[in-house]
Structure formats: C-alpha cells, structure tokens
Amino acid sequence: MITVFVACLFQCVSSLPAKLYIKTTLAERIGKLQTVIGIDNDIVFAYERLYEDLTLLNHTVVGETLFDLTGSLEEGKNSTVDRFLGHVVIREFHRLHAGLQYVSLRNFSVSELVCFVNNNTQLSGSYVFLAGNTTYVQIDLFNENRGFVHDLINLSSFLQNRSLHVLSFYARRFCVEDILNFYGKVVFGDSRHRPPQVFSKRDTGLLVCTARRYRPIGTNIQWSIQNQTVSDDHMTDDFIRTEIAGQLLYSYERALSRALSMTQRNFSCEITHKLLVTPALLTREDAFSFKGFVNPVKQSEDMFPRHNFPAPHRKKFNKLQLLWIFTVIPIAAGCMFVYMLTRYILFFVSGGCSLNPNRVLKRRRRNDEVPMVIMEVEYCNYEADDYMELHSVQKVRDNSIAVVCGNNSFDIERQSKISRNF
C-alpha cells in the first residue's frame, strides 16, 4: 500500500475561515484509488474506484493538487476563490475517459473557481478549465441546467453525478461569504461580543473596521454612531499589503478617532462595494441551500462511504514514540523518584550521619559549641589489641588536641602508659 497525503490549510479570504483537506490513497496492486475531500473535518466528498487497466497508474501523479489563494476585483470579478479542486476532479475525469485522445493531464493544468456579480447584481459562479491547450470549458455552477460554454467535452456523465454538486457547494459557500464581506452592516453596542470585522488597536485604543485581504478597488467603509454618519475628519484610513501565493492583496481599515472610540458606545460599521448596487439580494442562506441540493454535505455522506479523516495539522505519533511517552519515560521518572526518596529516608533515619566526612565536618562546625569534630566513625574499641580503628580527633578551645582513640592514638597512649610505669 502506497499512501500519499496531500494536506493544505485553506484560509478563506472572507470572514469565514475554512480548512480544506484532500487525502488520496492508492492501492497499486489492486488498482484502487480513493480521494477524500473534507472541510473543517467534515467529509464533503469521497470518491473510490477500482481500475482494471493498471497502466493508467504510470501516467498519473496521485495526490498532486494545486492550491492557489488569489483574489481579484477587476473586470467585474469580485473574487477568485481558489484553485482547490482542479487536479482532483480533472484527474478523476482523465481516468474515466483515458481512451479519448484529447484528454491529458497537461491539458488541465489551468483550472479555477470564479465568482461573479453580473449587471443585475445576481451572484453567479463558474468552474473554468483549459481543455486541449486551446479551449476553455466553463461550467455554470449556479444554473441547474448546467449548460457549458463549449460542448467539446460532455462532462455531465461524470461531473453531474460525482463532483458537480461538490463544486457548487464550494462555490456557493465561499463565493457568497466572499462577496458579503463587501456588504455587511455590523452593529454592536453594549454587548461584549464584537464581530470579526471590528477590533481595537492595543497601542492606541482606536476602534477599527476592516475588510481583510482584498484589493481596495471600489471598497468603502462607513462608520456610524447612533445611526449618524461619522465625517471623514474623525476617521483614518490604512491599507495593509499582504502577499499570498504570489498574489498581492490588501486589507482596508478605517479607524475612528480616539475621542469617539473612548466615549461613544453604539457603533455601526458598513462595508460596501461599488459593483453591488442592490446587495440585499445576496443572503447568507445562499451559502448552504440551492436548487437540487438541500444539504450537499449530508448528500455526500449518503452517496459515498464516510471515512475517518484526521486533520493534517495535528502531529501523529508512531508506536515507538507512544511507547517512550507513556511507558519508558514514566517508569524512568518513577525509578528516579523512588531512588531519591530512599536516599533521603536513609539519611534522616541514620540520625543525619553521612559517609561523607565533609558533610559531618560542616554540620558539626555549625552545631557543636566546645569541640569541633574533624572526623569521626564508630565507637572506640579499647579491648582489641591487634586492630584499632581511627575514630575522632577533637580540637579544644585552648588549641590543645585531645586524641580519643585510633591506631596511632592507641599506640601513643600505650607508649605513654609504659613510660609512666617505668
């Protein structure tokens, strides 16, 4: 089993963050390919197929996907959401129609999901890819008839039943959220909850309303206090440059003056775009319901088997690492604790004595008043003639030395007794 994991953290450019995961597994011997696409740990698409012609595996790079976070507002486009499903869907199409001469992986290197707002302020989305190196095929994701601009390739046999509803789900969810970031009246007052478009700068305390990661062409932010428009004299503008995947984007911020930010309470922030004449037609419900697919996530779970899909940003430990973490390290720490505890118990039970003379010396120098013990061991054995241990040498206050007992001291004391007897 050869397993290839391709994982990418997809941060949506609107106020809706999303994590996009793609997991592709290839069983080479049986020719089984499984592709699972998930968002925020929910499976929205799982495709599994057995291939009789194993020679197709030699012409396919499994797990290679293209993620390119881009944004654009020129020429009527409100945003290019992402190039996230291009390789997955098209590679599946290539496997199903491998006998066609005009189908090749190289021909489908250009693909993107685009959101538009037409002159009637209606939201529309298309999936565009390049076929045959010269022809662009555009699929209308918001049209239930799903007409194609060019009928060179009949994609309905595959896309309509397998992947088209997934593409439509992504388009409607992200495109709507993306465009709504240019039209949203954010009202807040005494409530502690503050919407993500509004924040306070820590250094200055200014109240800021922002439209993040967009080109500022046609974008407008207007502050209001108690339904009264704030003049431009009390606001400051700021553009922040951000480069994502080679695409230069901006964040447009408009901050209230410090006096208004600190004294007023009832604020409202309105983000608009010049292309949206009647933006009320765009509602957030469009992101989760559309014709033919009431609940695309639920339908995907019913149509395709659900698989365990771990988040790729979480670190996975192998069995050896888990053995060290939960077995070896705790046992070693426990043994060290028992060893140290045993040493301390033996030390205090023995009356504070230690085999190290330096410790005894320091302790006795602090505690003894008259004699200062330099070294001591066991009690003296005066009865033994052949063996005598060195026991203690004491220094008295008058600088005289009292020899208690020991091999040398016993000899000295013994010699003195002999001399006195004579």
UniProtKB/Swiss-Prot annotation:
Glycans are attached at residues 58, 78, 107, 119, 133, 154, 161, 227, 266, 407. It is a single-pass membrane protein. One of its GO terms (biological process) is symbiont-mediated suppression of host innate immune response. Residues 1-15 form the signal peptide. It is found in: Host endoplasmic reticulum membrane; Host lysosome membrane. It comes from the Viruses. Disulfide bonds: none annotated. The chain crosses the membrane at residues 322-342. One of its GO terms (cellular component) is host cell endoplasmic reticulum membrane. Keywords: Glycoprotein, Host endoplasmic reticulum, Host lysosome, Host membrane, Host-virus interaction, Inhibition of host innate immune response by virus, Membrane, Signal, Transmembrane, Transmembrane helix, Viral immunoevasion. SUPFAM superfamilies: Immunoglobulin. Plays a role in the down-regulation of the host stress-induced NKG2D ligand UBPL1, which enables immune cells expressing the NKG2D receptor to recognize and annihilate infected cells prior to viral spread. This is Glycoprotein U20. It comes from Human herpesvirus 6A (strain Uganda-1102). The lineage of its organism: Viruses, Duplodnaviria, Heunggongvirae, Peploviricota, Herviviricetes. The gene is U20.
